[in-house]
A protein has these predicted regions:
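Conserved alpha-helical scaffold segments that buttress catalytic/binding sites
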Residues: 2-305
Length: 305
């Protein structure tokens, strides 16, 4: 068995508070992801030293009238607890392998990183997640998370402990979006975020986008970087178990190339995996393929010296 470059802590932040109900009275199934991954062998595949879990607040559809976002106070409280755990993991020189949950879990992880120093973000997602309540039809935080962690939106989430922004715009790479509606992408295009939609990513080449990210690490002070992976970046033909599938998307070879390049870099601090919904994968076929493909790429990367 290979010895990991850093000890790995598997951290379960299985909050579903950032999503709306998939059907009346039914809460999103992403809360079950860590145990679904365990059942089908992910925890056995990835060499790790410890497992940590943080139970999220109860699910609701509550729309906070102050922030105009759902479950704002519960997400903020959970984020503060997350931050304490991630700070401890990273301070002990462990790699944080975080399992969601929905994309709102990035808020607590980002808060921890801001408290620890100056970190970059490589954001792999089938959507930009860059909007605010006036642009959102659902008011779910999981569709606004990248905007929140770069300082946009209500202070309840974007400015916890008066630390906004958790990531500077120019230190963020957002790759893989395939929602091309002009009204949707206008928000992110008016920022300093390095934005590669799926078409641009393929035209410029995956190695090119990653090389530019690594060059930014070398050009200025950085304490490390974090990787966000929303599995809806994958083609729904291979990853249909998500709440917002769109045609097209990355193949596993494309995703694995990114993961292996990023996670094997010595400044990579952690990876979060979000949105895979076991309720949409009743026989486990989809998660088994994810573990066989992306899980194996993660293990190879973390085991490199």
């Amino acid at each position: 068995m290979n010895v990991s470059r850093k000890p790995v802590s598997i951290v379960s932040f299985n909050s579903n508070l950032g999503l709306i109900e998939p059907a009346p009275g039914k809460e999103p199934g992403v809360k079950k992801l860590p145990e679904w991954l365990r059942k089908f062998g992910f925890f056995d595949l990835v060499d790790h030293q410890e497992e940590i879990g943080l139970e999220p607040p109860p699910y609701s559809m509550y729309l906070d009238p102050v922030s105009d976002m759902r479950n704002t106070d519960s997400i903020a409280a959970y984020a503060k607890q997350q931050a304490l755990i991630i700070q401890d993991v990273i301070s002990r020189k462990h790699f944080a392998l975080v399992l969601g949950g929905d994309c709102s879990i990035i808020i607590g992880n980002a808060l921890a990183l801001k408290q620890l120093g100056d970190y970059r973000l490589f954001f792999i997602d089938g959507h930009t997640d860059f909007m605010w309540p006036s642009l959102s039809s659902t008011h779910g935080v999981a569709g606004m998370d990248l905007a929140i962690v770069t300082g946009y939106g209500h202070d309840k989430l974007s400015n916890i402990h008066q630390l906004a922004p958790y990531f500077k715009e120019q230190n963020v790479w957002c790759v893989g979006n395939r929602e091309y509606d002009i009204s949707y992408i206008a928000a992110i295009e008016n920022t300093a975020i390095h934005y590669y939609d799926l078409k641009t990513l393929r035209q410029s080449g995956i190695p090119g986008s990653i090389s530019s990210f690594f060059a930014s690490l070398a050009s200025g002070p950085a304490d490390g970087f974090w990787v966000h992976l929303d599995v809806d970046v994958l083609d729904p033909l291979i990853m249909p178990a998500v709440d917002s599938p769109d045609p097209g998307g990355l193949s596993y070879p494309e995703l694995n190339m990114m993961l292996e390049s990023l996670l094997s870099h010595p400044q990579c601090t952690g990876l979060e995996i979000t949105i895979l919904d076991p309720d949409r994968d009743p026989d486990g076929k989809i998660v088994r393929e994810f573990i066989l493909e992306a899980g194996a790429a993660i293990q190879r990367s973390l085991a490199k010296e």
